[in-house]
Curated annotation (Swiss-Prot):
The keyword Protein biosynthesis applies. Residues 1-125 form the tr-type G domain. This is Elongation factor Tu. One of its GO terms (molecular function) is GTP binding. GO terms for cellular component: cytosol. It catalyses: GTP + H2O = GDP + phosphate + H(+). GTP binds at residues 47-50. Disulfide bonds: none annotated. It is an enzyme of class 3 (hydrolase). Keywords: Cytoplasm, Elongation factor, GTP-binding, Hydrolase, Nucleotide-binding, Protein biosynthesis. PANTHER family: ELONGATION FACTOR TU, MITOCHONDRIAL (PTHR43721:SF22), ELONGATION FACTOR TU-RELATED (PTHR43721). It comes from Leptolyngbya boryana (Plectonema boryanum). GTP hydrolase that promotes the GTP-dependent binding of aminoacyl-tRNA to the A-site of ribosomes during protein biosynthesis.
Length: 235
């Protein structure tokens, strides 16, 4: 459930596979689910390279990963694959936080992975010209301030002081945005693609729950009948 929730919001993903063990059953599931929910781009990191002495074994694991990706309609032959060791990189950075690029083999491999992500996963185009919409993922209260709904803004903009509608499950109601926060920073607004907390006026915690949405007033209506496509993972 949690993997699917996160994957539906992704513009790209890093698939981490142990170079020592190769693809595991959950690797196959993650690739399958990534394809089902529409993750557009994947890059691969073969971790624990420090545990593999045989270069041919490393090549075999890479080949297995590429074949697995291709079997689920990802371009396995074209996807960037980087081998390295996250542990070795972390150990080096803990010993010297100022390690420069080019001065340590393991840290450089993480830089190479980030380069792959920058090149292969394009910067998404954000839908700021459409009406505001955010699915509520979690709700909590801040003493003295009110109720905060958190989630990823799917489209549009939301600004402090705007009136929005709370739609779904319960009756549709209007509320005013009194604050927008992202990563513990207070903002004047949030835009499509941002993961934010939206502070709402006059809404109690019990009035809002996961599954509801915040939207620009009058832009959407709830429905009790709809057509859907369901994929059941059975193996």
């Amino acid at each position: 459930k949690n993997m699917i929730t996160g994957a539906t919001q992704m513009d790209g993903a890093i698939l981490v596979v142990s170079a020592a063990d190769g693809p595991m059953p959950q690797t196959r599931e993650h690739i399958l689910l990534a394809g089902q929910v529409g993750v557009p781009n994947i890059v691969v990191f073969m971790n624990k390279q420090d545990q593999v002495d045989d270069e041919e074994l490393l090549e075999l694991v890479e080949l297995e990963i590429r074949e697995l990706l291709s079997s689920y309609d990802f371009p396995g032959d074209d996807i960037p694959v980087t081998a390295g060791s996250a542990l070795k990189a972390v150990e080096q950075l803990l010993s010297d936080p100022n390690t420069a690029r080019g001065s340590d083999e393991w840290v450089d491999k993480i830089h190479a992975l980030m380069d792959d992500g920058d090149k292969y996963i394009p910067t998404p185009s954000v839908k700021v010209d459409k009406p505001f919409l955010m699915a509520v993922e979690d709700v909590f209260s801040i003493t003295g301030r009110g109720t905060v709904a958190t989630g990823r803004i799917e489209r549009g903009l939301v600004k402090v002081g705007e009136t929005v509608q709370l739609v779904g499950i319960a009756d549709t109601r209007e509320t005013t945005v009194t604050g927008v926060e992202m990563f513990q920073k207070t903002l004047d607004s949030g835009m499509a693609g941002d993961n934010v907390g939206v502070l709402l006026r006059g809404v109690q915690k019990e009035d809002i729950e996961r599954g509801m949405v915040l939207a620009k007033s009058g832009s959407i209506t709830p429905h009790t009948e709809f057509e859907s496509e369901v994929y059941v993972l059975n193996k």
